[in-house]
A protein has these predicted regions:
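Catalytic core of PPM/PP2C metal-dependent serine/threonine phosphatase domains
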Residues: 52-123, 144, 199-229
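Short, hydrophobic/aliphatic alpha-helical segments
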Residues: 29-41, 149, 206-210, 245-258
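Primarily the active-site beta-strand->alpha-helix module of PP2C/PPM metal-dependent phosphatases
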Residues: 25-80, 158, 170-186
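Acidic loop->beta-strand submotif enriched in PP2C/PPM serine/threonine phosphatases
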Residues: 19-34, 128-170
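Active-site beta-strand/loop microenvironment that shapes enzyme catalytic pockets
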Residues: 250-275
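C-terminal catalytic subdomain
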Residues: 166-251, 277-278
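Conserved beta-strand-loop-short alpha-helix elements that form
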Residues: 35-47, 111, 150-173, 229, ...
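Regulatory cytosolic signal-relay segments
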Residues: 1-22
């Protein structure tokens, strides 16, 4: 078995109450020939279909630029210049979190406007190996953070929209006066992993998103998106297949037809060979 980690990348999303579409977008891409995995999570301005259009444009362009290894600042400027301008706020805007990993190397995370990523090794948070912030001359009010992290089997990286960290804000609950916040999400993820060390990416993403949603169970105040990337050891799957146990099974009858056809084909082949020899 290879020592290289296997990546699980899974996301859970909830739509803001009253909206027909989630204003966040998540896209995942695996490039097998490059042993490379990419992910993009974007939160479009506002909510509903318009926000989804902004978010989808952002994730689509971001994945293409990462695939092409385009310069970070140039990529961000193209994305921001391409987004339509909101008629009310007079700004073009979509936040994003991007993930880029080559098998055997460091993982790269790029963020603008979204809550800061979480990197857990077991239940311990891991600091980045490199961390820098860049500012575009075109958009001086936007800061883009780029980090590189060393990863090991068992590590998890969590990306989310502010619908997760701000959940509970304005609900009147004392515990969520300032929302759930990143610290609350981090503590929750640690508890989940502590109780189930092999918890899958899909289950952890679902639990985080569901908890954020259920802080105000009567309504979802914002679009909620949580993406979890889990680096784990590959698992070996062995499958033994054969005819069904019960004769009454439709699959058994199918198996019988297949074996009967195979036997008939062998007889025809044998007869043809005998005729040719004669």
């Amino acid at each position: 078995m290879t020592d290289d980690p296997f990546l699980e990348m899974e996301a859970t999303q909830f739509t803001k109450t009253g909206q027909a579409a989630c204003g966040d977008d998540v896209q995942l891409l695996t490039i097998e020939k490059e042993n490379r995995s990419l992910a993009a999570l974007s939160d479009g301005l506002g909510s509903g279909v318009k926000a989804l259009v902004l978010a989808n444009m952002t994730t689509t362009m971001a994945l293409r630029f990462m695939q092409s290894n385009l310069d970070l600042l140039e990529s961000v400027e193209i994305i921001m210049d391409s987004l339509p301008v909101c008629e009310v706020r007079k700004i073009s805007y979509a936040t994003f979190s991007l993930f880029d990993y080559h098998l055997g190397g460091r993982a790269r995370i790029i963020e603008m406007g979204n809550p800061a990523y979480v990197h857990l090794r077991g239940t311990e948070e891991v600091a980045p190996a490199k961390d820098r912030t860049v500012v575009s001359a075109h958009w001086p009010d936007r800061e883009v953070r780029e980090v590189e992290v060393d990863v090991e089997p068992g590590d998890r990286i969590i990306l989310c929209s502010d619908g997760v960290t701000q959940s509970g804000l304005g609900s009147g609950q004392a515990a969520y006066k300032f929302g759930w916040r990143r610290s609350g999400m981090l503590a929750f993820a640690r508890r989940m992993i502590s109780s189930e060390p092999d918890l899958s990416a899909a289950d952890l993403a679902r639990r985080i998103a569901c908890f954020a949603k259920n802080i105000t169970p009567e309504s979802c105040k914002d679009d909620i998106s949580c993406l979890v990337i889990y680096f784990r050891h590959p698992r070996v799957l062995r499958i033994l297949t054969g005819p069904p146990y019960y004769k009454s099974s439709p699959a058994r009858r199918t198996w019988a037809r297949i074996t009967s056809s195979s036997a008939a084909a062998r007889r025809r082949t044998s007869w043809s060979a005998s005729w040719a020899a004669a």
